[in-house]
Amino acid sequence: MSRTLHLAEQLISRPSVTPDDAGCQALLIARLAPLGFKCETIVSGPEHFRVTNLWAKFEGFSPSAQAALAQPAIESIANTELSQAKVKTLVFAGHTDVVPTGPLAQWHSHPFTPSHRAGKLYGRGTADMKTSIAAMVVAVEEFLAAHPRPALSMAFLITSDEEGPGIDGTVVVCDRLLARGEVLDYCIVGEPTSVKQLGDMIKNGRRGTLSGKLSVKGVQGHIAYPHLAKNPIHLFAPALAELVATQWDQGNDFFPATSWQVSNIHAGTGASNVIPGDLVVDFNFRFCTESTPESLQQRLLAILSKHQFEYELKWTLGGLPFLTTPGTLVDAVRGAILAETGVQTELSTTGGTSDGRFIAKICPQVIELGPVNATIHQINECVDTASLDPLKNIYKGVLERLAGLA
């Protein structure tokens, strides 16, 4: 059996629904520590929502350290003493947590029992994103077996809180790394980015997300006596029409234009003869680098104020947009994908948010690359079994290119 497949099956068999890691990271530590990774477990969150995070790092070797180690008299010196000269660091990032399974009766096989049918590997987390993690680990194992003293540092940043609130996971680790001056250069997040075939799309950025909860104040009353009431739905309707029609920006070469969408509207008591006293609207901006949270807030507030109704508004900034323009990391990933699959990958910033938004604050080059995403979060989630080792080879190819070995 493929070593990548074997590790993937071990991870899938662990029921790691957010925030429960279910022993996945212990399994990773058991593979990484013998390779020379210094592994650090960071537990965060309240007692009822304990999150497990892993930071594991292998210190690379500068050319001078490699030359020194080639001398017989130097062999006894600890590797850490000879790897102090800084080399670039590549981080593999991901999450061991998965979304809930949904109705078990609708699965063809148990979601936490890896199974194979018609060339596909089934189980919760196969696509999102346990096969990516398995491929990353085996790629590093093979890379270090061939190049035990690479001119590249490597790290893993793994959390069990990506599918949940995301406040005790990757962001906590990034804050700690920033506080102690850890320098990161490149990061690959193992999100399932491929669309029709492995490697046909990678994410070199993501839009920001800004949400709001708007409460419009009216006066409740009898529907037959509207002059004695103030209908908040009617008050808000013209503003809603204007907000929907507003073009917030034009987008740019890397991002589509900023989008404003309403997700929920609630008003009324449920009775058909009562004018509601208030209206609650949940909305969200998915915004590109042409806009800022402040500019979007100011423009929306100006529209609301123009329509002269009483309201309260609470904002939640879920993440800023990030972008990695073509350069060292993008070129390495493109080259590795082309060499393994023959596919010319497409750069994209579409889709939802990911933990890349936190990592981008401390790492200048972040991309996302993983398996086909057609079944993520679905009943009978699966990936092509034959894609696992090619994904591993792509990750290994990136390592070789960043280390100057390809």
UniProtKB/Swiss-Prot annotation:
Q: Which cofactor does it need?
A: Zn(2+); Co(2+)
Q: Could you state one GO biological process linked to this protein?
A: diaminopimelate biosynthetic process
Single Gene Ontology MF annotation? zinc ion binding
Which Enzyme Commission number(s) are on file for it?
A: 3.5.1.18
Recorded hits in InterPro entries, A to Z, give: Bact_exopeptidase_dim_dom, DapE_proteobac, Peptidase_M20, Peptidase_M20_dimer, Peptidase_M20A
Can you quote the record's cofactor note? Binds 2 Zn(2+) or Co(2+) ions per subunit.
* Any Pfam family matching the protein: M20_dimer
What pathway annotation does it carry? Answer: Amino-acid biosynthesis; L-lysine biosynthesis via DAP pathway; LL-2,6-diaminopimelate from (S)-tetrahydrodipicolinate (succinylase route): step 3/3
Q: Which UniProt keywords apply?
A: Amino-acid biosynthesis, Cobalt, Diaminopimelate biosynthesis, Hydrolase, Lysine biosynthesis, Metal-binding, Zinc
The question of whether Metal-binding is a record keyword is answered with yes
| Catalytic reactions of this protein | N-succinyl-(2S,6S)-2,6-diaminopimelate + H2O = (2S,6S)-2,6-diaminopimelate + succinate
Enzyme class name: hydrolase
Binding locations of Zn(2+) 2? 128, 163, 377
Residues bound to Zn(2+) 1: 95, 128, 191
**Quaternary arrangement and interactors, per the entry?**
Homodimer.
Function noted in UniProt: Catalyzes the hydrolysis of N-succinyl-L,L-diaminopimelic acid (SDAP), forming succinate and LL-2,6-diaminopimelate (DAP), an intermediate involved in the bacterial biosynthesis of lysine and meso-diaminopimelic acid, an essential component of bacterial cell walls.
Identify its protein family. Answer: Belongs to the peptidase M20A family. DapE subfamily.
Q: State what protein this is by name.
A: Succinyl-diaminopimelate desuccinylase
Upper classification of the organism: Bacteria, Pseudomonadati, Pseudomonadota, Betaproteobacteria, Burkholderiales
Q: Which gene encodes it?
A: dapE
